[in-house]
Amino acid sequence: MKRFGTYSRRLVIAAAASAGLVASAGMALADSIKVAAIYTLPVEQQWISRIHLALNGAKDRGEIEYVFSENVANTDYERVMREYAEQGVQLIVGEVFGLERAARKVAKDYPDTAFLMGSSFGPVGPNFSVFDNWIHEPSYLSGMVAGAITETNVIGMIGGYAIPEVNRLMNAFMEGAREVNPDVKFLVNFIDSWYDPPKAKESAFAMMDAGADIMYAERFGVSDAAVERGVKAIGNVIDTSADYPNTILASALWHMEATIDKAVANVASGNFEASDYGQYSFMAYGGGSLVVDPNLVPDDVATKVAERETEITDGLFRVNVNDERPVSDK
């Protein structure tokens, strides 16, 4: 696979140092920070896996002590947050899309604990920070790949829920495809689930029957359908090309390392405060990247995409953020 904007620890440390984010590069913290993560899904789930990977990386470097709870129901989430806070955990990481108000109430009750939560809303002082996978930039680039390669000019798109965090990635993908192919049309559907491969697969088959020859796989199950029908797919958040050989044209990848490194450094220095960490998922910070399969993507397409990526990382091209629900063209 050919990687565009490939994440490397060297890149993130360089970006962080230039912005005054870390005191020194490559050095483990003198005293490891106690970190706990709370996940509503298994750590194998694509979105959760990126957070888990970044935290394990910090643990392996001796920067943090890391424990986690997975498959925590929304109804039980507040209790688990309180238990970790009572245990003296210094930084609690998680995702609170289904319990925004309750999570903020817990944070208010533990002002000396730092909270970093995936959220649809903003931070709340003094200690509740938020993040999300702002990978609209590589999503745009993956759209350019799809728009250039489709032969039927019909692309199918299947998402989990029509929430801003998903919508912005799908809209960016559509804009990227239209940049290189104004004639492309989209079929869009949401399965109203974060994990229902059979339902996603069924929806994908219906789109293929309607002429889609490339599928945007925001959820698991879509790429399985693509393999069965011999059409191509675009990946999201993680690289699944090894699991679906000769199928994944490109993937927009999310790297949580920059976000975690920033939060841990702030806790260690005593400077953690409520803020929005979303920018650390941008390509300029190494928080997002594009990976393409050179065996499936022609060189001229890859070159054009790489040129656009350089413009993005140099600040010469801005990918629009559109949180509105995407809709089908036909």
Model-inferred region functions:
Residues 108-133, 237-247:
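Flexible loop/hinge segments that line or gate small-molecule binding clefts
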Residues 123-145, 157-162, 245-258:
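Short beta-strand elements at the ligand-binding edges of bilobed clamshell
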